[in-house]
Amino acid sequence: MLPRIKIQFLNGQLGTVGESPDGLFALVCGAAAVTKKLELGKAYTLHSFDELDALGVTSENNPRLHKHVQDFYTEAEEGTKLVIFPVDKAKTFTELCDKDTGVIKELITAENGALRGIFVAGDGREATITTNGLDNDLFTALPKAQQLAEWATTSLYAPLFVILEGRGYKDGAVKDLHKEAYNRVGVLIGDTVKASEGAAVGLMAGRLATLPVQRNIARVKNGALKPVAMFIGEKPVEENASAVSDLYDAGYITPRKYVGKAGYFFTDDCLACEQTDDYAHITARRTVDKAYRIAYAALLELMMDELSVNEDGTLQHGIIMAWQQMMENAVNRAMTATGELSADADGTGCKAYVDPTQNVLSTSKIELTLKVRPFGYARYVDVKLGFQVETGK
């Protein structure tokens, strides 16, 4: 080879942030196969409602799958990605969510950890065994879904949450989800169809896909949901306010109405865990999960790197400062700068800390603490109202 000069363009020097698929969700739904077009247990990526035609899915052969996708794209713009995963109608939620034998695990693996949330729906059949106010399968699926999401987090470094369709609601008392410990799983009750055996999970997924990670699906400024009618069981939402309140108190997500506002809104974004859990809401879950992914990507570049140490085996000060700054910069660029974290006066929304006393030379292990600052939310507003009058006259 002749002597030469070769100049390469460097990339990644400006600190810009690439697209993050925070709203990439999967819809797992009981369905019927369509010959040569739709296979069960196979993932399909959609970008519009019309793409269902190519898969042979109609309101006649797959009414619930068709409805959920249609609902999704009434909230999300055409072009928004949605992964659909049709499954055997006979499979229970408990079977689907099993981290060892369930097919949703195969979906998560096949999508290479890209999914941020999974919405699980049945095919609309009547619930056969109902306890605690809902299909019993729902409650046995809750721990399975939690274990599945935890597996994705620890094994694939791909944290996600799961929303289960609250099947079989007939009014009356329900199990209190605030007494559970499933901070990666939520339950939706309520549909656009009267006396539905399922819930409008497509609608919820579509709304959530349009929002940044810190934004609550119940935020009034988001605007009303697109459907002109929504139901809790057999009653319209506006005629079932007591059920909406009771379900909210028990930790379920439902649609609601506000006096003076047209349309429907979600009540909140509760997950099936104690209200004191740091991750009791989808907003907290999505926020910290995004920080998790950013931290993993940043730290991966430092794996097996050489580290300068002091005589006692502890890290040199410069190394500690570099690691802390690297972590904070990565999160602040990707999240604080885009308004997804609550920034302090210096414009930072996170803090990284490396313990300077740890002996890295003997353990080859570095323990780092990363804390991100979330937003507060106006859930309860109390106003003291009275007359303003002048006294002494």
Segment roles from a protein language model:
Residues M1-G172:
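Small-residue-rich
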Residues H47-S48, L82, V87, F93-T94, ...:
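Compositionally biased, low-complexity/repeat regions
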Residues N61, G133-T140, Y279, T283, ...:
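Catalytic cores of large soluble enzymes that bind and process phosphate-bearing ligands
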Residues L208-A322, T369-K393:
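Long, contiguous, structured domain-core segments that constitute the functional module of a protein
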Residues Y296-V354:
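Extended, compositionally biased non-globular segments
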